[in-house]
Structures are given as C-alpha cells and as structure tokens.
C-alpha cells in the first residue's frame, strides 16, 4: 500500500517510491541513500514525537515529520 514515510509505525518497514521535494533537502536525502526501491524501517521517535528515527541501508537517520511527509513509500507486509 502506498503512503508517506511519516505514517510508518515503530518497527514497520517500507520501500522508497519517490521524494516529493526539490532543492538541497532532496539532494541531501538522495546522498543518504533514500532512492527508489531502498528499504527503510521506522525505529521510533523522540520524546516529543519529533524527529523520527529510521534505519536506511544500515544507517540511522533522524528526520523531521514535515520532511518525512514528502517521501512516498510502499509498505511491506
């Protein structure tokens, strides 16, 4: 099912479909390995719910919810 990265629950995995953003932030996320087909797993969030931690290619990334709303993913069963 297609959704956005911010909708993943802790422990849930998905594959990147597309980045719906432009400019420096898009480039930075691509450099971190957030490209189409890459598996990402939600590890949880900070005490206030933001940022959210994700595991991408063995690296832990902290993304703000507003940024993760711009990343389309396909959830895995």
Where are these regions (language model features)?
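Conserved positions in beta-strands of structured domains
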Residues: 6, 17, 41-43, 74
